[in-house]
């Protein structure tokens, strides 16, 4: 892949390798092996990037600069025949996998994570690549805050070719001397090393006073001494990173993941939508989150308001969002089930409540915690007024393990006393045969008795006619839950993994129903499709699902988070969707809110009420 610079020589090229490659060529051409193999468990922030598949496969190197971000060269992702920069923001055009913290690629250490999003610079060969999930057990590298100077020695890392290997399997390192520093680039010459194909995006490190700092990333090289190259010049060009710290910090702090909930947060009788965003990490490495409210109006939803944020210390990936009127004051609040870590007595989980003030939310209050023995990762949370006292409670479907008769699940209820939550009570359990990982949980008053119940959309397996899903209802008796009843099932053709579930009274008869936003896949023309099904309650069971809407244009199920509420204040609940609509060139996520207004027997076509970047 050629770097888009004025032509200097046919050897001066970009460094993304056109095949899976591994090591950096860093030594004299006279030696048998160019470059030093890196000792295991050092430079664990280094990442090997595998981009594309088959004949289009290429490889690059990068650096973990945040638990969920890799800094590398944008030329790695540029399409054939296109400039190295700028490249389009958003999802990579080719499937990209990052291997972080694995010195030997044939080993098993480190983490292997898919890259899901690119945030490029427009002025240089540089891009931030977002990982599908945070890598929390590997320390990111810090960025140098001053430019490399003439004569300075930098240590370069990479997984690219060596003098003798086209496809090495380990990280290599070697020295380079700085010869000049420009506005966005650094010129270097070999001082015991050579940069080869597959090293693009790899780090050039400043090592001094016991610190390792990222000073630049590899962009282009003459490739002297590299396998398959007859070049003799040892020059290379690096992309500066010392002057983009503010940009890297901004990207790290951009809203990433989101969780949605609905409720009447300002008490005006019209339900609203809340979005809980992952704001990455601060410059000091602290995790940040924010809470936005989309308040409903007579004409729809306006621009979201940031109603709470933290400069650090609250981790989105350890949070499960739910909502309800926990104080009984007529305004819905937000609750977060939080992974607090572990103690000598086991895993610790806590409940935080963001109490509504009507105009916003108070700072979160820890309204319940355990000293150990309650595992967040085994919990699925929902809310409802299960005892009918006018205050919503929290329920957790819990993975209790296994028994001789199969997988064991339990329901725990955290009853609100208006200020905090009582310790959880096990209000239902099974001796075996109910699998937590096959369950999606929701709440509603399905029999109309004034007490909310719990429903589970369950993956029942397969039949000759396709995938089988079922609905189970756990009816509240005010104190505990009755054993679950199968209130609907299909003989095949309804896929659990393609379903997102929510509850509401869509026909206004006083009994809550269930809705499923369903993934219809991709059409023959490449258009993403979705559908909406409603399961109407008759007070005892649910009617067979009715397909009340199917997308006619592009509607991406993976980008959708459905919630329910009476958004138009007509006495019938509607469906709302918080939808990720794209990414701005500077990496900010673009969200929109859709509502599917209930007609009593179906829903109207979705209406887009607001769309814009989340800051």
Annotate each PLM feature:
Residues 49-52, 65-67, 73-76, 100-103, ...:
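Active-site-proximal beta-strand/loop segments in catalytic clefts of secreted hydrolases
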Residues 1-32:
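Secretory targeting and sorting signals
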